[in-house]
Amino acid sequence: MKAVILCAGLGTRLLPLTKDIPKVMVEIGGKPLLQHHIEWLAKEGIREIGINLFYLPEVVPSYFGNGSKFGVNIHYSHQSTLSETASGFKRFEKFADGERCVVIYGDNIFQLDLKDLELFHEKKGGIATITLREWENPTAKGIVEMDNNYRILKFKEKPKAEEVTTNLGNAGVYIFESKLFDYIPTDKDYDFGKDIFPKLLEENQNLYGYRLHGYHLDIGTLEMLEKARKDFNQYEDLV
């Protein structure tokens, strides 16, 4: 299995900290957030990592290089325009070379047993497994409805309040089979939550949900970043 970390976001809500660095380079626990992800993947046995870049694209490669000092091989994709999540991932089709991929949103911090997630994915046999958690404000996330076998029946990105039927939503870590690339067109920009997951369900592809029970935080604002920094030493194995 290979890994792709999506890191192209502008990080405008983290200004002024992101004036000179991408948001994945903001420090938590004395290290850039992205370093925590890379070290975790290396510990879990992942050696090939793809990273997409847009905002201040020189910063990440100048720090991580080819990844050798972290025990991995890093492959960079430099985007000339900012893309949605699925289109950003599509750029790694040749890198994946037919292998399964774990995909991580670079601005999340979480606790996760990757081997258990992959075992779950293998047992279910779907095209994709989406990590899930409960959200206080599900209207800001992609929410899901599942059956008793954890198969996803419905995925709704950022629903209106009257459309909310559950607070269980997307936690930003996926495992994809390589054939998922076939469902991401190149004619325009595509997002996983708004476009690809609903499309897969319409075409009767099996998506499964894996519930996270440990720590998870979306570091999208200065307030959440400060919380992550305070929480870091209170939890084990945060990445």
Show where each model-derived region lies.
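Histidine-centered beta-alpha loop that forms part of the nucleotide-sugar donor binding/catalytic region
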Residues: 8, 54, 133-134
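A structural signal for short hydrophobic beta-strand segments in well-ordered beta-sheet cores
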Residues: 25, 143-146, 197, 209
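Catalytic-core segments of class I nucleotidyltransferases/pyrophosphorylases
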Residues: 100-102, 109, 118-122, 136, ...
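Hydrophobic packing residues within well-ordered alpha-helices of enzyme cores
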Residues: 14, 60-64, 228
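Conserved N-terminal catalytic core of the sugar/cofactor nucleotidyltransferase
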Residues: 2-5, 27, 31-105, 109, ...
